[in-house]
Curated annotation (Swiss-Prot):
It comes from Mycoplasma genitalium (strain ATCC 33530 / DSM 19775 / NCTC 10195 / G37) (Mycoplasmoides genitalium). InterPro entries: Flavoprotein-like_sf (IPR029039), RNR_Ib_NrdI_bac (IPR020852), RNR_NrdI (IPR004465). One of its GO terms (biological process) is protein modification process. It comes from the Bacteria. Coiled coil: none annotated. Belongs to the NrdI family. GO terms for molecular function: FMN binding. This is Protein NrdI. The lineage of its organism: Bacteria, Bacillati, Mycoplasmatota, Mycoplasmoidales, Mycoplasmoidaceae. Probably involved in ribonucleotide reductase function.
Protein backbone atom coordinates (compact mmCIF):
# COMPACT_ATOMS: atom_id res chain seq x y z
CA UNK A 1 0.00 0.00 0.00
CA UNK A 2 1.11 3.54 -0.65
CA UNK A 3 2.87 5.25 2.26
CA UNK A 4 0.74 8.40 2.01
CA UNK A 5 -2.61 6.77 2.81
CA UNK A 6 -4.96 8.82 4.97
CA UNK A 7 -6.64 6.66 7.56
CA UNK A 8 -10.37 7.29 7.58
CA UNK A 9 -11.76 6.97 11.09
CA UNK A 10 -14.42 4.32 11.63
CA UNK A 11 -16.85 7.05 12.70
CA UNK A 12 -16.28 8.89 9.39
CA UNK A 13 -17.03 5.89 7.17
CA UNK A 14 -20.44 6.13 5.51
CA UNK A 15 -21.29 2.54 4.67
CA UNK A 16 -23.60 2.18 1.69
CA UNK A 17 -27.07 0.75 2.01
CA UNK A 18 -28.60 -1.56 -0.55
CA UNK A 19 -27.19 -4.01 -3.04
CA UNK A 20 -23.52 -3.74 -4.02
CA UNK A 21 -22.97 -1.25 -6.82
CA UNK A 22 -19.68 -0.47 -8.52
CA UNK A 23 -18.69 2.49 -10.65
CA UNK A 24 -15.46 1.93 -12.54
CA UNK A 25 -13.19 3.26 -15.22
CA UNK A 26 -11.36 1.08 -17.70
CA UNK A 27 -9.31 2.27 -20.63
CA UNK A 28 -9.50 0.67 -24.06
CA UNK A 29 -7.19 -2.11 -22.79
CA UNK A 30 -10.20 -3.28 -20.73
CA UNK A 31 -8.06 -4.66 -17.87
CA UNK A 32 -10.32 -3.17 -15.20
CA UNK A 33 -13.44 -4.08 -17.18
CA UNK A 34 -12.44 -7.77 -17.26
CA UNK A 35 -11.83 -7.67 -13.50
CA UNK A 36 -15.26 -6.08 -12.89
CA UNK A 37 -17.01 -8.73 -14.99
CA UNK A 38 -15.61 -11.45 -12.69
CA UNK A 39 -17.03 -9.80 -9.56
CA UNK A 40 -20.68 -10.36 -10.45
CA UNK A 41 -21.99 -7.10 -8.95
CA UNK A 42 -24.15 -4.48 -10.64
CA UNK A 43 -21.87 -1.87 -12.19
CA UNK A 44 -21.65 1.22 -14.35
CA UNK A 45 -18.66 2.21 -16.45
CA UNK A 46 -17.31 5.74 -16.69
CA UNK A 47 -16.98 6.38 -20.44
CA UNK A 48 -13.54 6.43 -22.05
CA UNK A 49 -14.67 9.31 -24.27
CA UNK A 50 -14.08 12.44 -22.18
CA UNK A 51 -16.94 14.22 -23.98
CA UNK A 52 -19.44 11.75 -22.50
CA UNK A 53 -20.54 11.75 -18.88
CA UNK A 54 -22.67 9.68 -16.55
CA UNK A 55 -24.62 10.40 -13.40
CA UNK A 56 -25.32 7.75 -10.80
CA UNK A 57 -28.18 7.47 -8.33
CA UNK A 58 -26.88 4.68 -6.06
CA UNK A 59 -24.21 4.71 -3.39
CA UNK A 60 -21.18 2.97 -4.85
CA UNK A 61 -17.62 1.77 -4.52
CA UNK A 62 -15.32 3.25 -7.16
CA UNK A 63 -12.78 0.97 -8.84
CA UNK A 64 -10.08 2.94 -10.60
CA UNK A 65 -6.80 2.14 -12.37
CA UNK A 66 -3.70 4.22 -11.72
CA UNK A 67 -1.99 6.16 -14.49
CA UNK A 68 1.47 7.36 -13.56
CA UNK A 69 5.03 6.68 -14.51
CA UNK A 70 6.54 5.71 -11.17
CA UNK A 71 9.14 7.47 -9.09
CA UNK A 72 8.30 11.13 -8.73
CA UNK A 73 5.91 11.08 -11.69
CA UNK A 74 2.62 11.33 -9.83
CA UNK A 75 0.79 13.75 -12.12
CA UNK A 76 -2.13 12.14 -13.87
CA UNK A 77 -2.41 9.18 -11.47
CA UNK A 78 -6.21 9.54 -11.52
CA UNK A 79 -7.57 9.25 -15.07
CA UNK A 80 -9.13 12.46 -16.43
CA UNK A 81 -12.42 10.67 -17.01
CA UNK A 82 -12.61 9.76 -13.31
CA UNK A 83 -11.79 13.33 -12.29
CA UNK A 84 -14.57 14.60 -14.56
CA UNK A 85 -17.01 12.07 -13.07
CA UNK A 86 -16.09 13.06 -9.50
CA UNK A 87 -16.26 16.78 -10.30
CA UNK A 88 -20.02 16.25 -10.45
CA UNK A 89 -21.01 16.94 -6.82
CA UNK A 90 -23.90 14.46 -6.93
CA UNK A 91 -21.63 11.63 -8.14
CA UNK A 92 -18.92 12.54 -5.64
CA UNK A 93 -21.32 12.52 -2.68
CA UNK A 94 -22.47 8.96 -3.43
CA UNK A 95 -18.96 7.46 -3.37
CA UNK A 96 -18.48 5.36 -0.23
CA UNK A 97 -15.12 3.71 -0.87
CA UNK A 98 -12.42 3.14 -3.47
CA UNK A 99 -10.48 0.18 -4.81
CA UNK A 100 -7.45 0.80 -6.99
CA UNK A 101 -5.49 -1.15 -9.55
CA UNK A 102 -1.95 -0.50 -10.61
CA UNK A 103 1.36 -1.95 -11.70
CA UNK A 104 4.01 -2.84 -9.12
CA UNK A 105 6.70 -2.02 -11.71
CA UNK A 106 6.01 1.63 -10.89
CA UNK A 107 7.10 1.28 -7.26
CA UNK A 108 5.80 3.93 -4.88
CA UNK A 109 3.09 5.03 -7.30
CA UNK A 110 1.47 1.56 -7.29
CA UNK A 111 -2.29 2.16 -6.96
CA UNK A 112 -1.70 5.85 -6.24
CA UNK A 113 -5.09 6.77 -7.74
CA UNK A 114 -6.78 5.00 -4.84
CA UNK A 115 -4.77 6.96 -2.30
CA UNK A 116 -5.50 10.27 -4.02
CA UNK A 117 -9.25 9.61 -4.29
CA UNK A 118 -9.47 8.29 -0.73
CA UNK A 119 -7.85 11.44 0.64
CA UNK A 120 -9.85 13.86 -1.51
CA UNK A 121 -13.23 12.27 -0.78
CA UNK A 122 -12.46 11.09 2.76
CA UNK A 123 -13.56 7.55 1.91
CA UNK A 124 -11.74 4.33 2.77
CA UNK A 125 -9.27 2.72 0.39
CA UNK A 126 -10.71 -0.79 0.57
CA UNK A 127 -8.29 -2.82 -1.56
CA UNK A 128 -5.54 -2.69 -4.18
CA UNK A 129 -4.70 -5.16 -6.93
CA UNK A 130 -2.24 -5.44 -9.78
CA UNK A 131 -3.24 -5.16 -13.44
CA UNK A 132 -5.94 -7.77 -14.23
CA UNK A 133 -6.00 -9.07 -10.67
CA UNK A 134 -5.65 -12.69 -9.63
CA UNK A 135 -8.34 -15.19 -8.68
CA UNK A 136 -7.54 -14.32 -5.05
CA UNK A 137 -7.97 -10.59 -5.80
CA UNK A 138 -11.40 -11.28 -7.27
CA UNK A 139 -12.44 -13.35 -4.24
CA UNK A 140 -11.11 -10.79 -1.75
CA UNK A 141 -12.79 -7.92 -3.60
CA UNK A 142 -16.10 -9.80 -3.69
CA UNK A 143 -15.94 -10.34 0.09
CA UNK A 144 -14.89 -6.77 0.83
CA UNK A 145 -17.65 -5.23 -1.29
CA UNK A 146 -20.36 -7.61 -0.03
CA UNK A 147 -19.40 -6.90 3.59
CA UNK A 148 -19.11 -3.17 2.99
CA UNK A 149 -22.70 -2.87 1.80
CA UNK A 150 -24.97 -3.17 4.82
CA UNK A 151 -27.93 -4.82 3.10
CA UNK A 152 -26.24 -6.78 0.35
CA UNK A 153 -28.11 -9.71 -1.15
Amino acid sequence: MHKDIKLVKETEIRKPIGSPFIVYFSSISNNTHRFIEKLGFQHKRIPVDITQSITVSNEYVLICPTYSGGGNQVEGAVPKQVIQFLNNKHNRELCRGVIASGNTNFGDTFCLAGTVISKKLNVPLLYQFELLGTKNDVEQTQKIIANFFQNSN
